Amino acid sequence: MRLLLVLSLFFFFLIDGYSQDTRGGDKDNNASRSKNKIGRTLLDDSTKIMYGMNTTSYILSSQLLEGDTNFTQVDSSLNNFEKFSIFEKKKMRFQNLGNLGTPLEDLFDRTPKFFNVSSGFNSLDSYYNVIRNNKFYNTKSPFIDLELILGGKGRNKVDFLFTRNINKNWNIGFDIHRIASDKQIGATKTKGDRNVNSSAFNFFVYHQSKNKKVKLFSSFLNFSHQVLGTGGVDLEIQDLPLEYFLYNDSEVRLSKVENNDKRKNYNVFFEYKLLKKFKIYANVEYYTQNISYNDDNLSLNVLYYDSILNDNVVTADSFKLSSLRNRIGIKGSIARIEYNFYANYNLLNYKYSLDSLKSNINENFIGGKLRFKKDKFSVNSSINLKTNGNYEFIGKINNKFFDGSYTSGLYNPNILENYYNGNHYYWSNDFKSKFVNKLSFSVKVDYKNIFFSPRIELVSINNHIYFSNSKIPIQNDDMINYNVLGFDLKLGLFNNLIKFENEYYYSIVGESSKEIIKVPTHHNYSRIYYTNKWFNNSIPIQFGINIYYRSKYFGDAYDPVIQNYYIQDSFRLENYFRTNVFFLMQVKNLRIFAKMTHFNQFDTYGGYFVTPYYPGQNKVLDLGFKWYFFN
């Protein structure tokens, strides 16, 4: 915390000095400023109260790239503030390894996430993407956003943001993010036996010229995520379902192994308005990713591995990737139709530690986006076309009565699916592109204090690639079909003092696909809470419960060597029902929560598995604070 305060003070005075120096440098100006010092001080004192959440807004870098110009006011709501992990923010629609900051897999969306070729080491992408999509601020005053999570059993999280406007046209700032989680199973000491160490630093600059013809942003992101793995609880399949969960007293399957995912991103965006409704732009992004898996205890962990190919003493596998992405484009509007047309070039190279030479991939594609919007009705479409014939089309329609979307595309295999060279696995494939069709539709009924939205999603994938039970990639030649039905429900009761929110998924997997797509049939997440304002309507509060239910299924397992999830059919994850009880309060710019996670674990040795061999978080008290500072 001292380091954060020192850094914020340093940047504050550095920028404050710069902004003062640029107001004028001659002696007459200095004298004039001296004469007006008292009056200006009085003005400053009288206007301090003006700065706050109503005067502070931001825009995302992704919005700027697409041509959106709307700034969003900083969040001051208590809703869902108690959810500090991505796992909970996504309403537990993911698998993880039972701890804050561990690798994630989406339960219901098995379609490709990238049109560009990616590394395939994507289980930590959610943590990276939260930081990568920069927020550029219009602050009117210096602004600090501090979020501190003090989780029980050695789980902590800190997010610190400092930003300020140098003047009306320039904004500068930095983010610091930190996750530190102790092991929840197989710890060798009561405190400080780390499972996750994650840190990120992001520096950003945003500029808009006085005549609003030029927009520029630039950012540098340094991301480092370390997982000190355990391999999960050491048990025999015939002992399932487990009656006693020993957590930190458990024997684990791996000792002293380490995964590292280090990424850097340099991004520069430039936009120039040639005509009132016509702009040209360029975006350049340099990205690196360094992946490693280290096991210095190979002789003790040997039973975990299916094979050892090169070194019988230690495993020191690594993978390095770098890419230079360029986009140039035009965007504007004609009547109510907004357009964005662009060309992309991506030069990518990669190398495993056992390779003698780097491999290169050149990607070229063109694309375009169209958007029509009138009142609450909008239509969006986008298409990307690669030189090799692959494509991606996305269409969306939204209005007050229904939402619909359709996605169709041919996607290249990622690097990991096609090629891997390490101490425990080797493969070299020439997989075909994956074909995806996805149709989603939902109806919205919004009447007084009731919102109800039934939905359906139909997914077909041809040439689907997955990691088999032997932890190697396989391409399925047949068409895979699975459907997800469900609904969202929101109720306000007793003049909205009691609120109920519910999200339900019902999954239907085709008979020929059940051995490949493993999802729970039923998945439900509810939030029931009391909301009011105490102390003369000055302090908003919420008190309630989160309820999570997942039906039994053979969930995907996780392999730290390839840092990916793979299918299995021997370890069944049983039905489980979990509740969290929370209390939230807001005092001016300070928000506070207290939450009893896994409240319904009344037996110390009770529990459930969230992923094969990895128990879900046991009962623990979590505390959190989020504080905005202005001026």
Regions found by a protein language model. Give the residues of each.
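Flexible loop and strand-edge segments within Gram-negative outer membrane beta-barrel domains
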Residues: R194, F204-Y206, K212-F269, Q289-N301, ...
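Membrane-proximal, glycine/serine-rich, low-complexity loop/turn segments characteristic
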Residues: S19-L240, V257, Y272-F278, N398-F402, ...
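Gram-negative bacterial Sec-dependent N-terminal signal peptides
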Residues: M1-T22, D26-D28
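Short hydrophobic/aromatic-rich motifs at helix boundaries and adjacent loops
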Residues: P103, F115-S118, N129-N134, G173, ...
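Structured extracytoplasmic
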Residues: K91, Q95-D109, S299-Y305, F319, ...
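Short structured motifs
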Residues: V130-I131, K157-F160, R253-L254, V313, ...
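Exposed, low-structure sequence patches enriched in small/polar residues
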Residues: L4, L9, S19, S141, ...
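Intrinsically disordered, low-complexity boundary segments flanking structured domains
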Residues: F12, N129-K135, Y529-K533
